[in-house]
UniProtKB/Swiss-Prot annotation:
GO cellular component, one term: extracellular region
Annotated NCBIfam families: A_thal_Cys_rich
Residue ranges that the Swiss-Prot or TrEMBL entry lists as coiled coil: none
Full protein name: Placenta-specific gene 8 protein
GO MF annotations, alphabetized: chromatin binding
Organism: Homo sapiens
Amino acid sequence: MQAQAPVVVVTQPGVGPGPAPQNSNWQTGMCDCFSDCGVCLCGTFCFPCLGCQVAADMNECCLCGTSVAMRTLYRTRYGIPGSICDDYMATLCCPHCTLCQIKRDINRRRAMRTF
């Protein structure tokens, strides 16, 4: 009788990184406020509320929807080109516009059933 060689498992079966995101673009421009006036008004007059909505949409807690990290997470999740530096500069220069852009993008991806 032959002894069987031991099998060494180096990775857990069925667990690993998910599929790579497909390349896409933002659904609307950063200053494309008139494509969804409700989001624009909410971002202008109740910025913290919109930040909480975005955070909740992304299953995050607190007001981190307004942060560079949230924008970077969203961009990388959907394969949107850019860099952390781009996200930082956009969020620094116009936080209202960037937050509204993320919320419009979420709404459009939901409508397309890709969110």
